[in-house]
Amino acid sequence: MKIYTIIGGVNGVGKSSLTGVLAAESNDLGVIIDTDKITAALGGDRIRGGKEAIKRINNSLKMGINLTQETTLSGSRTLKTIKKARELDYFIRLYYIGVNSADESIKRIKNRVEKGGHDIPEQDVKRRYNKRFEDLANILPYCNEVKLYDNENGFVEKAEYRNGELLTKNKDVPEWIKSLKQYKENPSQNPEATPPGFLHETESA
């Protein structure tokens, strides 16, 4: 079985860390495509890094090998890749990570920068955070397996999405998953709806 694994979540939630955990536990992640590492290797040029990441994804799909991608899910690129992978009979697996506030993501990004990591403008973080449920909802119908992890205090699997339903693991449900469930039930009433003009994104983790 060919597997396309997506490590999703807004900026600063710990996508690379979860990839590391999963890689230590499993041998089916295949080629791991980390746009930030690719960009760093290209001298920090994010445009070149993004293009190279897309090239590696497309090559992996063409070769029919397992691949793993870290993404904020913003923009239309991930959905296009998922649809292409499905046409090629890939099993689509999504591990989505969340935290309860944009401020928490921003704090973690600042901590990352202090350790030599890459920065993300605060306005971009907040915009993507406010639009996260819409971005997630767009790809859920195309995924064969979805697990949702809370990362307030280490990675804990809190829910899964199956047969069109969001199923929580126990009574200790994070606020962001409660909000996601409300959004799924009534998207038009989303209290965190994206302001006009913020519909198109350039990927950046």
Tell what function each PLM region has:
Residues 1-4, 64-65:
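Pre-Walker A (Motif I) flank of P-loop NTPase domains
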Residues 7:
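Hydrophobic anchor at the beta1->P-loop junction of P-loop NTPases
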Residues 10:
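P-loop (Walker A) phosphate-binding loop of NTP-binding proteins
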Residues 14:
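Conserved glycine(s) of the Walker
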Residues 17-67:
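Conserved substrate/cofactor phosphate-moiety recognition/catalytic segment
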Residues 69-74:
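Short, glycine-rich nucleotide/cofactor-binding loops
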Residues 139-205:
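NTP-dependent small-molecule kinase module
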